[in-house]
Amino acid sequence: MESNGGGGGSPKEAAVVVPSSGDATLGGHLARRLVQVGVSDVFAVPGDFNLTLLDHLIAEPGLRVVGCCNELNAGYAADGYARARGVGACAVTFTVGGLSVLNAIGGAYSENLPLICIVGGPNSNDYGTNRILHHTIGLPDFSQELRCFQPLTCYQAVVNNLDDAHDQIDRAISTAIRESKPVYISVSCNLPAVPHPTFSRDPVPYFLSPRLSNQASLHAALDATLAFLDKAVKPVLVAGPKLRVAKAGGAFVDLADASGYAVAAMPSAKGLVPETLPRFIGTYWGAVSTAFCAEIVESADAYLFAGPIFNDYSSVGYSCLLKKEKAVVVQPDRVTVGNGPAFGCVMMRDFLSELAKRVRKNTTAFDNYKRIFVPEGQLPECEAGEALRVNVLFKHIQRMIGGAEIGAVMAETGDSWFNCQKLRLPEGCGYEFQMQYGSIGWSVGALLGYAQAVQKRVVACIGDGSFQVTAQDVSTMLRCGQRSIIFLINNGGYTIEVEIHDGPYNVIKNWDYVGLVNAIHNGEGRCWATRVRCEEELEAAIATATGDKADSLCFIEVVAHKDDTSKELLEWGSRVSAANSRPPNPQ
């Protein structure tokens, strides 16, 4: 990481930097292209190889450079921004910055997010000279960083020649949007200010032609699916996380309305479909599903999964009671019907839209759900001053998001996954977490990026262990004037790891978290931090955060017992532990 990692001007009041060599420069072209695809904030850490490029990014009127405290958080911020805006970008320096941001790029790749990672590279004259440069591993071959990025990006552009720079940049950015994956752009440090005829002042706007379904394949898939679903007695509909990639959320809602099926969402699809749908029955997550949801899904004689990802986490250690012969699996460009045929070149949005027009309405599964459903009981009342329980915390968070203008809820890897899944999201409230990659600390940077992209406040639930990984970019939230509400759950360690496999390594040093945030605040910007230990203090803190301090970044440290976990985490942890502990197959 660069020693000057906290550098860069305030993103709200960045000094105007005039490019040194006219308008038709590489740096100016890259900046305009970013704005054109919807990026207005680039999350950056300055280093000597990217400084001139940052000058040109800052000079673009529609672009802000948000200086982050480290490259990992810059990458996480671009991840969060992409979730809200559809595309995100970060800028770092060569190798020391690139390898630091790489973990975040891996997370964005796994979550199918278009993220443009820009790296300031060596001077173009140094390529092929056998020179050894700083910020390298001491070899004259500068390709080590590129080779690290290749498995984690869908396109890589090494721009060290102006003649093909325009084409490489345009192709990289368009590929990120089209494939919904990260891309890597390395720009030699001596090129951003150099004019070239290919960098016109107003580049031709991007036009990405939509992927079209093969009509014969589409109709064959529809016929097979309708025959499969219409003969079922109690079919159900389940949303998966690839609805985002396919941009098929609206088509899924149309199908839910037309079919009458009971509707569930996989955990990583929470927030992608409205939970206000009339036949929504909750989260399907195997043994840790919303009450009565798994019973309805797993007992169905047919289920349509739209954009699922089945891994060891989403299947609770491969323990879901699903059968392939009962499933229609719709992926962004493919449909598979039971044990029968698979239909390629079928776009999910087209398929779901057409299916909604032809499907036969069947409310049997939802009718069964209504018969067996028993409302959850009331939480026991807390005694005055009684130590705060985590379930009481989330009772109050549920009330808060229902009554305040909250744009999204973000859940950090850990018990917050399970507690936040139980929140019933109001109309228009998003939900984000990183289930496939599961990198602890992700939510701090992602919160920074997401909040920078939206107008409404964002709520984040973060465990103490995760917060210690990436805490310093609370500083950047303050510099950006953000108003998020952070609930820091202090239970003394890595609780999710404890429930998978306990050991002394899961205990962490306790911090004075409120004191830390106040030190970061240092009287600059709007920030309010408090610690709560009982329900009365929590109620007062939420009232203040949504009232007098509604224009501030609010940090509420919630002190909880180390063994206060959700029952879902206990169940999930034991099943994932069993999956991890399988003995080697006989050789």
Swiss-Prot record:
It catalyses: a 2-oxocarboxylate + H(+) = an aldehyde + CO2. Gene3D superfamilies: 3.40.50.970, TPP-binding domain. Residues 415-496 are annotated as: Thiamine pyrophosphate binding. SUPFAM superfamilies: DHS-like NAD/FAD-binding domain, Thiamin diphosphate-binding fold (THDP-binding). Mg(2+) binds at residues 464, 491, 493. It is an enzyme of class 4 (lyase). The keyword Hydrolase does not apply. Its EC number is 4.1.1.1. The keyword Metal-binding applies. It comes from the Eukaryota. Homotetramer. Belongs to the TPP enzyme family. This is Pyruvate decarboxylase 3. It comes from Oryza sativa subsp. indica (Rice).
